[in-house]
């Protein structure tokens, strides 16, 4: 798989349900190309096939200027065409995240409105924008009905006890 460059605004069919323009940077006049990781498109198509509903892309590629203007992370995977913020109408974000993890997606952020996925090679999950990134180990890691986690024992705090990482369990941090 590779990251490909497309001319912003030019529609190219990438898979059965996704077109290049869905990934275009939303910045105005700041860039002319769109970077898209083929692996990301494959993941999104698998998610679309599994749920049988449209996967809406809030944000795909972001050029550096637009990413800075919206307060994006300085090393955001969006700037490399390796990330998408998505939602599926009438599907809980946690359900989409659980499926994303089951198909091998390693970068997953869960928000009230949807999820962030990316093609990073290190396993990272986070919940809501206020939480710190937490490196995780084990599979699967995202649980909807997790026991209450005492986050006072860890440096990186989790925003919601509904999300549990096997790493915490292995360290005895879910008393």
Language-model features: locations:
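Extended, low-complexity, intrinsically disordered C-terminal regulatory tails
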Residues: 41-71
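Soluble non-cytosolic domains of exported or imported proteins
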Residues: 34-41, 90-91, 159-162
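Sec/Tat-exported extracytoplasmic proteins
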Residues: 48-51, 100, 104, 172
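Solvent-exposed, polar/charged alpha-helical surfaces in well-ordered, non-transmembrane soluble domains
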Residues: 42-45, 49, 94, 98, ...
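Extracytoplasmic cell-surface/polysaccharide-interacting catalytic and binding patches
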Residues: 1-50, 121, 139-142
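Short, low-complexity, charged amphipathic interaction modules
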Residues: 150-175
């Amino acid at each position: 798989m590779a990251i490909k460059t497309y001319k912003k605004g030019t529609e190219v069919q990438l898979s059965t349900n996704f077109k290049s323009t869905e990934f275009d940077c939303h910045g105005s006049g700041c860039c002319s190309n769109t970077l898209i990781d083929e692996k990301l498109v494959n993941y999104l198509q698998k998610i679309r096939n599994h749920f049988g509903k449209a996967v809406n892309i809030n944000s795909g590629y972001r050029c550096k200027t637009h990413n800075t203007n919206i307060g994006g992370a300085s090393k955001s995977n969006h700037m490399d065409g390796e990330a998408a913020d998505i939602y599926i109408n009438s599907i809980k974000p946690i359900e989409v995240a659980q499926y994303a993890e089951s198909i091998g997606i390693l970068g997953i952020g869960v928000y009230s409105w949807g999820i962030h996925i990316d093609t990073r090679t290190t396993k990272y999950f986070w919940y809501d924008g206020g939480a710190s990134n937490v490196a995780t180990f084990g599979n699967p890691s995202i649980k909807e009905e997790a026991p209450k986690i005492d986050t006072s024992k860890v440096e990186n705090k989790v925003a919601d006890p509904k999300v549990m990482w096997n790493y915490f369990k292995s360290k005895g941090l879910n008393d």
